[in-house]
């Protein structure tokens, strides 16, 4: 930075310039104080007079001083002409930003809600507004409206305990009571007494039968006659009835013609199969109780 060299003939000009600068600075401070009094939006900024700072990068002569003086007078005159006269008016934002007092006015001008498909078919250029919809289940959608049906195998359809209208659905017992047994095809005692005409006349035996073949087989028990021998090599067994021989012969061959429909087990005797089926009936009752408990827990 070079130091300013001012000739002695220009001292009077600099005294006048300093006086005008002080007057100009005082006038600006007074103007900003009045503006701060009428508008409290911001604090008054400090006044900086750029004309008080003289930076020269070279020697100073009379021509530079005259140019600076003329520029200073021009700036001061322009600033004084632009100063507004009279008290300053405060800012009023009411006419620039009208207030919406009624929120329903905006809602009344909104278009009625439309589905995305209806909005697309209407050909409107405006984007479809987002609508947050809450899913409310229907009161009719209760547990009772759900059906628990499924296809069953032939073993369930053949069960005579299930009514015809309920076949093809899952069987749930209506109560904890055991299902009533279907009466067997065996005849009652009165009917059998009328049909039993074949009586055994051995002393001390009063058995009667509906068929003569049954009476003949029974009489062989008293006489000890066994006309049906086993023909398997090395076997000397003899039987009084042919069905007993057939049953015995299966022990040699290993044949099991009586198969269970519920599982894969097979038996050589029909009475053994009947005993096995009773176990399945007990298991079905237990399963029915478990299904009933699960259903009651679900609802």
From Swiss-Prot:
SMART domains: ZnF_C2H2
Expression induction or repression: Expression is repressed in response to high levels of dietary calcium.
GO MF annotation list: DNA-binding transcription factor activity, RNA polymerase II-specific; RNA polymerase II cis-regulatory region sequence-specific DNA binding; zinc ion binding
Annotated stretches, region: Disordered: 19-38, 146-189
GO annotation, biological process: regulation of gene expression; regulation of lipid metabolic process; regulation of transcription by RNA polymerase II
Pfam family, one: zf-C2H2
Function statement: Probable transcription factor which regulates lipid metabolism.
PANTHER family on file: KRUEPPEL-LIKE TRANSCRIPTION FACTOR, KRUPPEL-LIKE FACTOR 2
Family indicated by similarity: Belongs to the krueppel C2H2-type zinc-finger protein family.
Compositional bias ranges of the Basic residues kind: 23-38
Protein name: Kruppel-like factor 2
Zinc finger boundaries on the chain: C2H2-type: 198-222, 228-252, 258-280
Effects seen without this gene: Lipid contents in the intestine increase by 44%, but increase is less in response to high levels of dietary calcium.
Tissue occurrence: Expressed predominantly in intestine.
Biased composition (Basic and acidic residues): 153-180
Name of the encoding gene: klf-2
InterPro entries documented for this protein: Znf_C2H2_sf, Znf_C2H2_type
Keyword annotations from UniProtKB, A to Z: DNA-binding, Metal-binding, Nucleus, Repeat, Transcription, Transcription regulation, Zinc, Zinc-finger
Presence of the UniProt keyword Disulfide bond in the record: no
Localization in the cell: Nucleus
Gene Ontology cellular component terms for the protein in this record: nucleus
């Amino acid at each position: 930075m070079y130091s300013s060299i001012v000739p002695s003939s220009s001292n009077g000009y600099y005294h006048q310039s300093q006086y005008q600068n002080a007057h100009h600075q005082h006038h600006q401070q007074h103007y900003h104080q009045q503006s701060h009094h009428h508008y409290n939006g911001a604090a008054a900024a400090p006044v900086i007079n750029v004309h008080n700072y003289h930076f020269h990068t070279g020697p100073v002569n009379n021509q530079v001083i005259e140019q600076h003086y003329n520029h200073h007078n021009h700036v001061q005159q322009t600033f004084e002409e632009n100063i507004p006269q009279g008290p300053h008016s405060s800012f009023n934002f009411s006419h620039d930003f009208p207030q919406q007092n009624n929120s329903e006015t905006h809602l009344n001008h909104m278009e009625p809600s439309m589905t995305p498909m209806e909005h697309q078919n209407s050909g409107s250029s405006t984007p479809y507004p987002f609508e947050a919809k809450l899913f409310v289940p229907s009161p009719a959608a209760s547990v009772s409206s759900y059906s628990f049906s499924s296809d069953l195998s032939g073993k369930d359809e053949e069960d005579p305990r299930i009514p015809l209208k309920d076949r093809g659905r899952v069987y749930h017992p209506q109560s904890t009571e055991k299902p009533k047994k279907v009466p067997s095809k065996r005849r009652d005692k009165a009917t059998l007494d009328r049909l039993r005409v074949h009586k055994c006349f051995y002393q001390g035996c009063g058995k009667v039968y509906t068929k003569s073949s049954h009476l003949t087989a029974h009489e062989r028990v008293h006489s000890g006659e066994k006309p049906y021998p086993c023909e398997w090599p090395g076997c000397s067994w003899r039987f009084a009835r042919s069905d007993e021989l057939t049953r015995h012969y299966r022990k040699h061959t290993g044949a099991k013609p009586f198969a269970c429909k519920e599982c894969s087990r097979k038996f050589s005797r029909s009475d053994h199969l009947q005993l096995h089926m009773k176990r399945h009936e007990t298991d079905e009752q237990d399963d029915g109780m478990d299904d009933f408990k699960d259903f009651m827990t679900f609802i």
